Each structure stands twice: as structure tokens, then as C-alpha cells.
Amino acid sequence: MSSCGVLVVAGTHGNEVNAPWLLQQWQANPDLIDAAGLAVQKVIGNPEALRRRCRYVDRDLNRCFLPEQLEQGASGLEFQRAGELLRLHGPSGEQPCAVAIDLHSTTAAMGNSLVVYGRRPADLALAALVQGALGLPIYLHEADAQQTGFLVESWPCGLVIEVGPVPQGLLNAGVVEQTRLGLESCLRALYQVRQELARLPDALVVHRHLGSRDLPKAENGEPQALVHPELQGRDWQNIASTQAMFRAADGTDRCEAWVGGEIPVFVNEAAYAEKSIAFSLTRREVWPVEPNWLLALKQLLAAA
């Protein structure tokens, strides 16, 4: 690796328009976001999907970073774009980056939040620094064989900033502002690590992925009930064991069992209907921060 640059990606999904608009404004006004002296590469993840205002053209780009398929030359616009991003800005690319920050929005009531994939020490260090600065909740997504190939996993360190709720395709000033705050906090944290100024909090609070639930469906795949109105909008919240998950058109509740301590996230996210996900379930955990997390991030940024 010849650079510790930072890759900032917006528009990984073409109908998530707020982060691309923010990057366009940043390009026009470099003082809009403090890059903290870092070498930042600003990229639209899926330009064609953004032009069409659709999530993707052939396949979800954020599931295309699969080494085996990329090595075999998998076809389709998004696989080609994934390979191009790695050739340009991957750890050994033409303009190599060590860190990737992927900017997303959601129709779910996730607020301003972070998504971390797995338990790489450098990722956890960056997430802990941002959580310590802004108090953002963290969704730790791991051990889900049905959901793989995420963009940030192809860089040595990476986080997703996820902001919502906002309808697909709608520009919203509040969402843009929250995205900017999250991005600036990430860049500031990386600067502090490089300058030996970073101080990790004592603990990291994560919501660890347990699995996902789909809507009840008939044999033909049509939903028989929808997310319960009292569950809608309750991302990150403790749910009573008696709370119904779903409600049918006639008002009948579907009371499937909750396991104690389960907390929903991405409740009724519009884009996940095609993935047969009505919401995901997590468990809130408090982890002691380990010294090797910050060391891993320091070593990564010092490798330039």
C-alpha cells in the first residue's frame, strides 16, 4: 500500500440521492467539509443507477464485492463497477486508499447511525471514536451468509454511515446535514489517529446482528400481513415480548414470539422487500475497548 487515502463513496445505491448531492456540493466548495488534511477520493459508487434514480441496474452494487466472482470476471454493470473501484482506489489501486466510508440513506427510522461488518480491529477503533464523539448507534452485521459482498469489506478499514428516515429519491436537508456530521467525525477521527491525538472511550456499544424476519407470505409470495403499526419507526428500541410483529388487512395481529432482548433495526426498509427482509433483529452489547483496536488503525494509517 502506497497511500493512506480515504475513499468516500456516495450513491452506491442510485435512489439514495442525499449523499451524492452532498459530494457534489463539496466538490464545488472544498471548504464545505473539513477533510482534516487527509487525501480524500470522492466517488459516486453507481453513476448509471444514480442517473436512472434506481437502486441498481443489474445487481445491488453493495453485494458485488465478492473476490471469487470478481476474479472470474462476473458479468453485469455492478460487478464491472466493483472491479473498477478496486482498480482505481483499492489498497493496491491507481489512487490507493486504506479506508472506505460509504454514505447511505434509508427509509427506516435509523437516525444517524453506523454499520460495521465483522470485527476487524481498525473498523472497531474508528467506530468507537465516532461513537465517542457523536453518540451514534452501531449496527454490527456479521455471520449472515445470505448477505455478503459489501463494499467497505474490500478495504482494510471501512464504515457505513446510514441516515434516515427519508423516502427514496428525495433530497432532505436534515439527512444531508446528518450525513455531513457523520463524515466529518470520521475524517476528524482518522486525523487524530495519525497525529497521535486519538483517545478511545472505555466501552463500545453495538447492536449485534442476530438475523432477519420476513413478512408472513402466501405460497405465491404475496404478503399476508404487514409490519405492525406499533413496531413501525421503533428501530433501536427495546420491544415488549407481547408486541405483535405484523398486522393483517382485517386488523388481526400476528403475534410471533420475540426472544428477550431483541431490538429491531431497518424496520420496513423499502429496499429490503426484494431481499425478503421486513426487519432485522439485534442484541445490544457493551464491549470493553481493546488496546489492539487503536494500534491496528494506527499501523494501517502509518503504512503509507
Curated annotation (Swiss-Prot):
Originating species: Synechococcus sp. (strain CC9605)
InterPro entries according to UniProt: AspA/AstE_fam, Aspartoacylase, AstE_AspA_cat, Aste_AspA_hybrid_dom
EC identifiers of the protein: 3.5.1.15
GO terms for MF: aspartoacylase activity; hydrolase activity, acting on ester bonds; zinc ion binding
Positions of substrate binding: 55, 62-63, 162, 272
Note on how the cofactor is bound: Binds 1 zinc ion per subunit.
Top-level EC class: hydrolase
Disulfide bonding pattern of the chain: none
GO CC, any one term: cytosol
Keyword list, A-Z: Hydrolase, Metal-binding, Zinc
Binding residue positions for Zn(2+): 13, 16, 104
Lineage, opening ranks: Bacteria, Bacillati, Cyanobacteriota, Cyanophyceae, Synechococcales
Chemical reaction(s) catalysed: an N-acyl-L-aspartate + H2O = a carboxylate + L-aspartate
Origin superkingdom: Bacteria
Name this polypeptide is given: Probable aspartoacylase
Entries under SUPFAM superfamilies matching the protein: Zn-dependent exopeptidases (SSF53187)
Stated family: Belongs to the AspA/AstE family. Aspartoacylase subfamily.
Cofactor or coenzyme needed: Zn(2+)
